[in-house]
């Protein structure tokens, strides 16, 4: 052994402290001895210290250690040596040493387990011990492999023959709890009951339970608390006797409810299938239980049981509800139930009538009905209210006949059902589109809503617009009828619409227009045809035809049927008209056709009457279609060269016409100019004659005036001067009068202006003063209200304290300084020292009073 301290083995003197020791090897006899301190050991030459100095092992109270290969001691607890002086050892043995005086390890001894505290086992705990050697424990003999418990409270003293497998703690069993135990081998439980290996049992006693040595806790089982609204569904895992003393067979199922116990802890041989809720039925509910449990507790397989409310019950194991809890059928006057018998029984609701399996019948309201277990409810019927323009298709399930019921409220019987009438996809699309056949014949609008699905059991109705007709064919009667609008058409079960597939587009293409109703017109259609003249000029014409159907008597069945004799009357009419036009144009030169196109086309289409005049209409006798007029919208050559030549000829004709009109206008202008010149010369001659006549009269007047001048010149001068004076005086008077009137008008206007200005200014000042007074009044009211609110919010005592705070503070300050009066000023200010303190305090108080008065204002 090597020294743990790494001592220098060449040293000769070893100082061993108290409770220390060393191992010294004697090389002469190869014996190792122990030297215990306190001591100073002088090593001899033939000795070598192989271990130490090392501290002795000290075991405090309630501690222990394990020594391997312990020394042999005699009866007096002394170490035994052999004849060579070497200590004897129990090799491959162990010794457990408890609290004692410190001791050294002798050569060969090994400290297998250091000093360790003894295990203190608490209450409700135990140590599972297992014997690894045979030994006797007092009066009890233990065999290797035996197990037992050291139960607390206590301190466990270990033995070398025993090992501690585990610490077991007691399981706390609370109210409504139990623990499931299993025997690991044959043993007796705490109550002394013998248990075989693998057997399980329960302990329900409330408190702490400490499992035995051969017992193991499998699980803690909680009790199921039962109420009035739930029950516990149990199944036996083996045959046993339950807590009531009843034998339960393996696989048997049963219920435990509150009537049996408030809380149930499942036994070890009971398996909880689930918690079953109570089923509660009101007085308007019922249910059918399948495979009900009989009075003997056994299920009656294949039977049913009707339960009506008010009642509450639990479903027993094996029982099921057919379609769950159902409501009682409350039937009104317009409702009924279709019933079907499942088995033969007497119907108490029908005066004891015997119902055979498969029978169907109907009960009508008003009533309250609960179906029995012998029958089933097929369906619930409700009367279908129908207006005069509404209907439904009904089929008799016994005879297969289909009929239409309209204009009444109808309820299907037990042998009737709604029949769905199928239509072709094209007719379905036309019916669902809900377009107006007159106003919405085009599909160019892309914002149309999605079509609504048709209810196929409803009678198909179609509104025929004014001046239109619809043909309906009855495949059963093999007859057709034509209905003229405005009318509402309702199809019978075997009737179908005659669908129209008309040509459309420009030029006409077949099967473009789909329609159910035939418009009688008048209307127009436009077509583009290609013709060829006698000189092989190919032209393209765009023509528009006005058409209508000539139906003088709509009650005439034969005449009405002729309307639908031609499936595509547009295409046939356009083809017939185009054929006539081509035939007529084929024998005409291009120039003639170009000059007389309208006449040629009208004559070719309408033909001539007995007087060789063009007829006014073209009649198709097959379907009474009448063409009344033709509009030539455009004529264009098909060949490009012909088109260019025609354009040149048209330009040349325009130039010729223009030149002719220009020459005519020039000749007319020259003629008018000559006529105007002649009238002017004549007028000059007449003016000269008139001038000569006027000159003659002038000479006569000059002669008369000369005579008058010679005889009364003086008189005339006097009269003229008098008249001039008179006129001058009247003018001066009028001028003075006008000036006076002008001055008066000016003064009146100025007075009116000043009056208006003063009145306006006075009104403005008055309104401004009123506004100022109103503003001042409102401001004073606001200030008064504000001050009142401030006074109310602060309080009179607070205001008084604030007013007195300044003077009181000054008085207190002066009193604290011991001064009667104080004045602080500079050298340039004169001071009146009379009544100084009173003046200062009075001035301060007066200032506070002034401020207070201002605040009140």
UniProtKB/Swiss-Prot annotation:
Domain IQ, residue spans: 665-694
Q: Does the keyword DNA-binding apply?
A: no
Question: MVP repeats located where?
Answer: 18-60, 62-122, 123-174, 175-227, 228-282, 284-332, 333-387, 388-441
Q: Which GO terms describe its cellular component?
A: cytoplasm; nucleus; ribonucleoprotein complex
Question: Which parts of the sequence are annotated with region: Disordered?
Answer: 434-453
Short name of any one Pfam family annotated for the protein? MVP_shoulder
Subcellular location per the Swiss-Prot or TrEMBL entry: Cytoplasm; Nucleus
Q: Which residues lie in Basic and acidic residues bias regions?
A: 437-453
Which keywords does this Swiss-Prot/TrEMBL entry list? Cytoplasm, Nucleus, Repeat, Ribonucleoprotein
Report where it is expressed, by tissue.
Expressed in embryos, tube feet and coelomocytes (at protein level). Not expressed in sperm cells (at protein level).
Q: Does the keyword Glycoprotein apply?
A: no
Q: Its quaternary structure?
A: The vault ribonucleoprotein particle is a huge (400 A x 670 A) cage structure of 12.9 MDa. It consists of a dimer of half-vaults, with each half-vault comprising 39 identical major vault protein (MVP) chains, PARP4 and one or more vault RNAs (vRNAs).
- PANTHER family xref list: MAJOR VAULT PROTEIN
The task this protein performs is described as: Required for normal vault structure. Vaults are multi-subunit structures that may act as scaffolds for proteins involved in signal transduction. Vaults may also play a role in nucleo-cytoplasmic transport.
UniProt protein name = Major vault protein
Q: Which organism is it from?
A: Strongylocentrotus purpuratus (Purple sea urchin)
């Amino acid at each position: 052994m090597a020294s743990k301290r790494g001592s220098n083995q060449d040293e000769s003197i070893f100082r061993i402290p108290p409770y220390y020791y060393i191992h010294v090897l004697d090389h002469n006899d190869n014996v190792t001895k122990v030297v215990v301190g306190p001591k100073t050991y002088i090593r001899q030459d033939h000795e070598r210290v192989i271990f130490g100095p090392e501290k002795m092992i000290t075991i405090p109270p309630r501690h222990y250690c394990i020594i391997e290969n312990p020394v042999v001691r005699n009866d007096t607890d002394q170490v035994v040596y052999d004849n060579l002086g070497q200590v004897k050892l129990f090799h491959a043995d162990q010794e457990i040493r408890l609290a004692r005086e410190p001791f050294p390890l002798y050569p060969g001894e090994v400290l297998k387990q250091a000093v360790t505290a003894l295990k203190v086992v608490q209450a409700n705990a135990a140590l599972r011990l297992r014997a690894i050697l045979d030994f006797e424990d007092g009066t009890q003999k233990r065999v290797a492999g035996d197990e037992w418990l050291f139960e607390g409270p206590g301190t466990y003293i270990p033995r070398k023959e025993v090992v501690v497998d585990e610490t077991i703690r007691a399981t706390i069993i609370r109210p409504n709890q139990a623990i499931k135990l299993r025997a690991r081998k044959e043993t007796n439980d705490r109550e002394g009951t013998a248990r075989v290996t693998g057997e399980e049992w329960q302990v329900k006693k409330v408190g702490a339970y400490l499992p035995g040595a051969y017992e193991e806790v499998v699980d803690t089982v909680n009790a199921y608390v039962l109420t009035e609204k739930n029950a516990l569904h149990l199944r036996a895992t083996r045959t046993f006797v339950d807590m009531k003393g009843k034998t339960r067979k393996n696989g048997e199922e049963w219920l435990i409810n509150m009537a049996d116990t408030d809380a149930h802890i499942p036994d070890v041989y009971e398996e909880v299938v689930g918690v079953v809720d109570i089923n509660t039925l009101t007085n308007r509910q019922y249910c059918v239980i399948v495979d009900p449990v009989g009075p003997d507790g056994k299920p009656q397989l294949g039977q049913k049981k009707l339960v009506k409310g008010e009642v509450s019950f639990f479903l027993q194991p094996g029982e099921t509800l057919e379609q769950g809890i159902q409501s009682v059928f409350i039937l009104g006057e317009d409702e009924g139930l279709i019933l079907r018998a499942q088995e033969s029984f007497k119907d108490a609701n029908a005066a004891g009538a015997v119902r055979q399996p498969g029978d169907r019948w109907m009960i009508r309201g008003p009533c309250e009905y609960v179906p029995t277990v012998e029958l089933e409810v097929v369906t619930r019927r409700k009367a279908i209210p129908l207006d005069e323009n509404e209907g439904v298709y009904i089929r008799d399930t016994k005879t297969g006949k289909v009929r239409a019921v309209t204009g009444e409220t109808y309820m299907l019987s037990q042998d009737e059902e709604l029949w769905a009438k199928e239509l072709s996809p094209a007719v379905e699309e036309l019916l669902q589109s809900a377009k107006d056949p007159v106003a919405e014949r085009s599909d160019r609008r892309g914002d149309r809503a999605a079509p609504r699905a048709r209810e196929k059991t409803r009678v198909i109705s179609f509104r025929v617009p004014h001046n239109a007709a619809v043909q309906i064919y009855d495949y059963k009667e093999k007859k057709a009828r034509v209905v003229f609008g405005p009318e509402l058409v309702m199809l019978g079960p075997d009737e179908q619409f005659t669908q129209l597939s008309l040509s459309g587009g420009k030029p006409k293409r077949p099967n473009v227009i789909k329609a159910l109703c035939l418009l009688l017109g008048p209307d127009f259609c436009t077509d583009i045809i290609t013709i060829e003249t006698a000189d092989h000029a190919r032209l393209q014409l765009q023509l528009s035809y006005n058409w209508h159907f000539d139906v003088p008597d709509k009650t005439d069945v034969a005449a009405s049927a002729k309307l639908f004799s031609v499936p595509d009357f547009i295409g046939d009419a356009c083809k017939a008209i185009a054929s006539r036009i081509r035939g007529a144009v084929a024998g005409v030169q291009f120039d003639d056709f170009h000059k007389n196109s309208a006449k040629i086309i009208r004559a070719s289409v309408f033909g001539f009457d007995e007087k060789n005049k063009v007829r006014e209409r073209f009649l198709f006798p097959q379907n009474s279609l009448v063409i009344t007029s033709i509009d030539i919208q455009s004529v264009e050559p098909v060949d490009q060269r012909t088109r260019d030549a025609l354009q040149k000829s048209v330009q040349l004709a325009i130039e010729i016409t223009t030149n002719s009109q220009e020459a005519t206008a020039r000749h007319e202008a020259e003629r008018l100019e000559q006529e105007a010149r002649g009238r002017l010369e004549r007028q000059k001659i007449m003016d000269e004659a008139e001038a000569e006549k006027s000159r003659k009269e002038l000479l006569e007047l000059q002669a008369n005036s000369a005579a008058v001048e010679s005889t009364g010149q003086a008189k005339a001068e006097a009269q003229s001067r008098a008249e001039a004076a008179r006129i001058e005086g009247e003018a001066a008077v009028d001028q003075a009068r006008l000036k006076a009137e002008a001055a008066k008008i000016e003064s009146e206007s100025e007075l009116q202006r000043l009056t208006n200005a003063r009145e306006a200014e006075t009104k403005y000042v008055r309104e401004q003063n009123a506004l100022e007074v109103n503003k001042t009044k409102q401001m004073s009211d606001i200030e008064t209200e504000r001050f009142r609110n401030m006074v109310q919010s602060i309080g009179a005592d607070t205001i008084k304290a604030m007013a007195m705070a300044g003077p009181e503070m000054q008085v207190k300050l002066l009193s604290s300084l011991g001064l009667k009066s104080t004045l602080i000023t500079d050298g340039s200010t004169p001071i009146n020292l009379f009544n100084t303190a009173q003046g200062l305090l009075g001035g301060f108080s007066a200032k506070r009073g002034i401020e207070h008065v201002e605040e009140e204002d």
